[in-house]
Amino acid sequence: MEESDTQEKIMRLIEKSLESYHQGKYDEAISGYDEVIKLDSEYGDAYYNKGIVLFDQNLFEESNKCYDQIIKIDPSHKEVWLNKGVNLFMLKKYEESIQCYDEVIKMDSKDDMGWSNKGESLVCLDRYEEAMACYDESIMINDKSAYVLFMKSKLLFDLEKYKESIQFCDKAIKAGPEDSDVWFCKGNSLKKLGKNEEAEICFVRAKELEK
């Protein structure tokens, strides 16, 4: 098969596999990506997309096999290191996930997700001060991520810094969209401070959002 014909076939397979993925036909999508890999064993996008399909099925180890193949081809692919770190986090391999996020940060010190994801892994290892520093770095880069603002408020709550926790809950609510977990966190902090009426208002709002 000529090179141009091979490329044409690859593009058709990629397109069809993406369509299958969006239709929830994961097995078909994976088969398509495997066909691409047979035609070109260094076609990074096929491994990357296959990794995402496997992640969506909670097949984290299998997903990382795909990402490892890409790293062999191109170790400077930032998103691959980020995704690999998430898979390792899901497998509760927190130290290994941190190594991946460090690779991301080494490539791009302004990657807010690299910092925030590293923070989450550090929390799971009870390394709270380091985690807080990571959340702070992430927020300095992007102060509009409601999720990271909430993760910081949650950590502050666990460290019994209730007033500060409330401040970051408010920032998360402002950044939006509203989330019941943020309102519950704010309510719990208010309750710890003896502000029961204000806490109840937060709990009511949290329950409304859960409906």
Language-model regions: role of each:
Residues 8-39, 45, 49-56:
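Alpha-helical segment of the N-proximal tetratricopeptide repeat
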